[in-house]
Amino acid sequence: MIAKTTIIISLMFCSTAMALTDKELTDVLTAIRTVESNNNPSAVGDNGNAIGVYQIWKSYWKDARQTSSIGGVYNDCFTPDYADRVVRAYMKRYATEKRLGREVTQEDIARIHNGGPNGYKKSATVKYWKKVQKVLNDR
């Protein structure tokens, strides 16, 4: 019994999993795609620096690949399924309870996507979150 309790407590405090449900994560990612590109896989923005439905920068893609085996090349970000894997890998790295010190929210996901690993703390990402939130609320 002590071993089971220790394992449960360890999982509670050491977990890096996001607290969002799969549906909540999928919903916010869908809203981000809408805000970023209106779901256009061919979208190119930010003077050619951001591509695909999520408007992924090369540095974001490289960062996501640091702790994930997603493979591929940067231009694969034009493929929505691949781009989704990139964003999920990025969030698995940065949108964690351990990093944030609390449960991860949809707002955190949106603000980290927009502002980088510490985007959830940046006032500059609040306006972006409001856009994503509007899409979520209008669904």
Where are these regions (language model features)?
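Sec-dependent signal peptide recognition
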Residues: 1-9
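Secreted/periplasmic proteins that engage bacterial cell-wall peptidoglycan
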Residues: 31-71, 91
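Extracytoplasmic/secreted cell-surface and envelope-processing proteins
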Residues: 41, 121-123
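N-terminal signal peptide c-region/cleavage motif recognized by signal peptidases
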Residues: 14-16
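Alpha-helical segment that forms one wall of the substrate-binding/catalytic cleft
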Residues: 58-120, 129-137
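Extracellular/periplasmic catalytic domains that process cell-envelope and extracellular macromolecules
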Residues: 23-25, 47-49, 103-106
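Short, functionally critical alpha-helical segments immediately adjacent to catalytic or ligand/cofactor-binding
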Residues: 24-40, 56, 87, 108-117
